[in-house]
């Protein structure tokens, strides 16, 4: 599992940027990054330190960060249920976009999923996220017009706050 991420670290090291497995020690920097992304939705419980720690314990090798000079400049929460992978909160700091960092992080997360025997991965992007939607199509993801997405709130305290 970590072997494939080491390959990514070696590929990008010359650029002073590495992609590595996310740990709970990255939380403060990742939270700061999330809070700077316009249109981003942050949930009070799921995205709290405790919520992210629970997610990372369940999925210890599939979430990644891009780091340059000790600073987190990109992140993907990625996990699976044993059948399908899912990416959440894919983001790159605005001044680092359009350099392939998002694509490299997505590839690293997908390699980690493949190493765990996962054959398919999905993600949700807000319709208003034109930059993200364009990116996913550009890197070969399929937009599903044949599905409806439903969710049901089990805990009303898990409020989503949108960054404007």
At which residue positions do the language-model features occur?
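Conserved N-terminal entry element of GNAT/NAT acetyltransferase domains
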Residues: 1-25, 156-164
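Conserved acetyl-CoA-binding loop-helix of GNAT-fold acetyltransferases
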Residues: 98-111, 138
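Acetyl-CoA-dependent GNAT
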Residues: 21-89, 106, 112, 116, ...
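Conserved acetyl-CoA-binding loop of GNAT-fold acetyltransferases
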Residues: 137-146
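A short, internal acetyl-CoA/4′-phosphopantetheine-binding micro-motif in the GNAT/acyltransferase core
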Residues: 90-97, 125-126
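Conserved beta-strand-loop-alpha-helix junction that forms the acyl-donor binding cleft
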Residues: 123-132, 151
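Conserved GNAT acetyl-CoA-binding A-motif
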Residues: 113-125
């Amino acid at each position: 599992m970590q072997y494939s991420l080491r390959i990514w670290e070696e590929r990008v090291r010359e650029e002073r940027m590495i992609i590595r497995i996310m740990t709970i020690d990255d939380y403060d920097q990742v939270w700061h990054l999330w809070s700077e992304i316009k249109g981003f939705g942050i949930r009070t419980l799921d995205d709290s330190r405790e919520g992210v720690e629970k997610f990372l314990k369940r999925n210890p090798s599939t979430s990644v960060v891009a780091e340059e000079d000790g600073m987190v400049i990109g992140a993907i929460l990625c996990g699976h249920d044993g059948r399908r992978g899912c990416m959440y909160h894919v983001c790159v700091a605005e001044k680092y976009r359009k350099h392939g960092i998002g694509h490299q992080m997505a590839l690293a997360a997908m390699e980690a999923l493949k190493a765990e025997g996962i054959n398919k991965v999905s993600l949700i992007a807000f319709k208003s996220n034109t930059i993200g939607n364009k990116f996913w199509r550009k890197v070969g993801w399929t937009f599903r017009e044949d599905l409806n997405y439903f969710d049901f709130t089990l805990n009303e305290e898990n409020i989503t706050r949108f960054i404007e």
